[in-house]
Amino acid sequence: CCSTNCAVCIPCCP
């Protein structure tokens, strides 16, 4: 999910 929608998957990306 992070690869496409980081903002929606937080906290998923650094």
From Swiss-Prot:
Tissue pattern of expression reads:
Expressed by the venom duct.
Q: List the disulfide bonds.
A: 1-13, 2-9, 6-12
Family membership noted in the UniProt record: Belongs to the conotoxin M superfamily.
An annotated GO cellular component: extracellular region
Question: In UniProt terms, what function does this protein have?
Answer: May act as a neurotoxin.
Q: How is it modified after translation?
A: Contains 3 disulfide bonds.
Superkingdom of source: Eukaryota
Per UniProt, subcellular location reads as: Secreted
UniProt GO molecular function: toxin activity
Task: Give yes or no: UniProt keyword Disulfide bond.
Answer: yes
Mark the transmembrane ranges.
Answer: none
Domain remark from Swiss-Prot or TrEMBL: The cysteine framework is III (CC-C-C-CC).
Q: Which keywords fit this entry according to its UniProt record?
A: Disulfide bond, Neurotoxin, Secreted, Toxin
Report whether Repressor shows up as a keyword of the record. no
The signal peptide, as residue positions, is none
Name of this chain's protein: Conotoxin Fi3c
- Coiled-coil annotation reads none
Species annotation:
Conus figulinus
